[in-house]
Amino acid sequence: MKNLANIKLYWNENDFLIADMLLILKLSPRSSSDCLLDLRDRKWELVCCKELNIGNERNPLNVPLFELPVNSLELQNSVSNDMFKHVYSQNVELNHKTQVDFTEQLIPKKSLNKLNGTLRETMSRMPSFESISLSETSNALDDSCFNDDWITIESEFSPPIDRGMTLEAMDSQNDTLFTSKQLNNGPNFPVEKATFFLESNMGLSQRAAATSTTPVCNISSVTSAINSVGEISNASHSSSTSELPCTYGNTSSIFQVKNEMSNIKSAISEGYIAHDQQSKKVSVQNIKKEFLIPFEFSLEGGFLNYNKTFSNLYKVLSETEKTRDSKVWFTFRLVLKTKPLYASESEFYETKLNFFTFPLECAINFHIDCSCFDDWRLFSLKESSSVAVPIPKIKKESGRSMFQSLLFQFNHCIPFRLSWINYKQSQLNIILTETTIRPRICAAYQKLEYNILVLLNEKPSSGSQLILSASPTCTIENIYIENTRLHFSKSQTPEQTVISFIDVQCVKVTEATKTLELSVILSERLVYETALKLPVIKYVKGDNRFCFKQLLEYYDIYLKFKLLADWRLLTNPVLQIQEISDYCHFKLLKKVNRNLQIKTNYPTQEFHLLRPTIKILQISKHEYFLHFSSSYIFNDARERDVYGVKLSKNMWISWAYVDNCEANFFCKDGTYFFRTTSRKQILLLEIGILIKPERYNLFKYRVYLPQFLPPTDSRTLVEFQTIVYTNSTLLFDGSFYFSQNGGFDFEPRQNYTYFDFKSEFIILQNSYSIYGPAKNIIKLLLELIEVILNVNVSTTAMCLLTLLIGIYLILQVVFIYTN
């Protein structure tokens, strides 16, 4: 048994990101309260919290996924009758769902109603949230075949896949899916946003042996159930109520819509959507009323706590259950919202959701890309981390405190699966690709084995190519298609591996309309404390040159982890889907110091930095080379001739380019200035910087990011106070620490480190500009005045000292201009 969190992401009409969560946790009834969520950063706002009373049977929600036995795929490219088969099809009933009365059970797409403090969100009659198990195993499987930690990222618009369907039937089904007015409750609904289904398991213990049918909580009107052999079946609500840990899919039984519609007491919060039953239109309600948290929950200090003494479930528990050490299953429905603020359509939004279930702490990072591809119109979930990080327990031994190790076992973290599902099967050759990762312990070292399963619309012919994006250290163990003998050759480059099919022979005649299953098995040796690039099939080139590039061409997938060689443990794995096109977005914001009233005739020009990238190369043991490139965007096209970059004392600029032309630059007081006479609104700046970090201990270095000053007139210099980094995330192989003075410390582990971050640089800038070296005198004058104000001297003495300093300043200015 395990703790489980089902998380569903979608967007509402007001561009709020909604996280609808179902938490099934095993908590001790002896404790009075438990902390569920950490909302201290105020990025997520609580919309709804509700405890689901599902009866005495409190079995957690389990979705078994099985890994493939190694001996199931023969390594000689031959075929056996006992060959392992994969089931990708659902029952026909899912393709022909019954008619749904929208007025009684469902609300149109992306609509929200709050009923008695409970937010009820339902989807239209679309095949959403069918979490497809892509494996079939024999009944005789031990515990080692279970997959404890796995991630499924699935588009809401994925129709059910039937192996026996023809391509024409798939195409017609897709057309019906995306053009039906009854389905979308209106004219052609634009496929502009998608829902992702993320399942993460937060448990430490392994799952018990395979049981009977395990239900899946589902929002749709038909509850999907995945049995122990990986098949997907349907069960009515009446027949599966006794087995379901929660009736999450039965909206009428949980929320009692008909009874509660007449007892609406709490209004809809600001920015949410109400539904007009008569006109069937969605309208925005701007009623400003706070959400009333139920008595069994409390929001204190940014933490959402669950108070058992106020819950209905706690009241029905017997006194024996309340006092004993055994835990009881609790089920919660939590709905959160956040407002991603994009400065442009190419910006990223990143947020984190923290769960607390002692002794586990689980953090899920969402990195959402706002850009859309050609016809996908798809918001992509770029980064997800579903790893439960154990909080160490402290125990006393021999009079001293010791930390008890609660690290994950090797097979607790992996294998897991990452699935990409395409909803336009008839247009692309690749329907689905799935990667299963599992450890293999050899005599002298450890390695990871990747099993990539691909669903194809057509069989590869002789001369076809399969392009695999993988690390050069990956070794191809086997390529297999059921009932087919393959002869292939490969050519490998640092970026990709090209597999050319020489001869494709069909051993057993099969129906040409069935989808084909291609298996590619690779292995890679583990290296201590490194980041491995996960292999991904990006193209299958044939006569029609179909590809899956809309989803996979722009991404490299990495598995970051630390390998403890002594204990053979895999800790803190993070799945990252990282974009290949090196761009991110941040902007420079000016905050004027209102205390200074000095005027100037040369104001600075507002600008933005677009798509800045920073790459760091280690050229020697204690020297680094930083390559920075970015685009300056201005409000107008006036002539600009000076750009300033302020560097720390241990950094030097070696070369600079402006608009792909070598630029002249000069240094003054640690600030480098570049001259240009261009009148463009967008200028590209590239600089190369040599760095010799300050080594302040044995392992870590200190490096300061360059400060980019606004472009000014050649006669104007701007005095900056400090630079502040907010909402910054740096992804690289190593640990980093921000310091208070704007720098960051990092520990390099590789010769090449890539910094991919989305930051908002806030420059605290004074509202005055000063001529030439007089700025230093003004700065000194202000410092002296500040010192004088802190000393107990008479007013006369302070005035005399200020007068003397003013006379000295005037003489210095006259001397400068006369020379």
Curated annotation (Swiss-Prot):
Disulfide bonds: none annotated. It is found in: Membrane. Keywords: Meiosis, Membrane, Transmembrane, Transmembrane helix. This is Meiotically up-regulated gene 45 protein. The chain crosses the membrane at residues 797-817. The gene is mug45. GO terms for biological process: meiotic cell cycle. Has a role in meiosis. It comes from Schizosaccharomyces pombe (strain 972 / ATCC 24843) (Fission yeast). It is a single-pass membrane protein. The keyword Glycosyltransferase does not apply. GO terms for cellular component: membrane. The keyword Chaperone does not apply.
